[in-house]
Amino acid sequence: EKEICEMIDFKYFKAEGYVPDKRYTLKEKIVELRKILGVASLENLTSFNHLVSYRNTREFTTKSIVNSNIMLELASKKARDTTTTKLNRKKLEKSLPALRELTRQDPEVFPQRLHDILLDCGVVLVGLPALPNANLNGATKKFGNGSALLLLTDRNKVSDIFWFSLFHEIGHILENDFSSDDENGELYRRSEERADQFAKDFLIRPEDYQAFVEKGNFDKSDILRFAEEIDIHPSVVLGRLQNEGILSFDRFRELKENYYFVS
């Protein structure tokens, strides 16, 4: 347990108010962490949770699995009894256009609206500050009562990554895809690719994107005009062009907003 405790950044729990801000011995840290996470032993955190779909940014290591599981546990505790509404995928699908419209709304306004629309469909949205070494952008999990958790961490939460991560996770939920398999890299990759493709095509319709790219004009004014036409946040267009290598990542940074999304 000591080795596991040393993989965990205890400062996070002080900063987020889970424990009083004082000095702790290793032994005390272990006791506190067991309490916070509701586990008999921290060793329970080392196993990959197959009932969860993770969007991670690097390969899984024991350290990242431990820290990802902690984030998941913290999010689950927050979300567990929020609603008895069962996940309704049809309703979620019908709500997609309303969710997409939020990309152009003020960051002060959209989080509540986003939370409400999802809750109405049986999805509890939780935003958590990223725990160091968790390498986690988001995750989804189904609760015993039929509702679902959608966790987003504030890791790299620039506006384009935020919306992409959100719709990636919604893609998993719509596919009823709530499991990851670290043993079977091929399956995991396919399920991630499906969710990525869903997010891409939903945020910018393939035919619209194709037509825009074929014109070959990628000035700031072109990006703003196209974003206006298809009614999406300009950073989503910019992020797509950057990810596909059409523009470099240092261009037009001013089109991206930083969101601090913690619920």
Where are these regions (language model features)?
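Active-site hotspot residues in diverse enzymes, especially metal/ion-binding acidic/histidine motifs
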Residues: 1-263
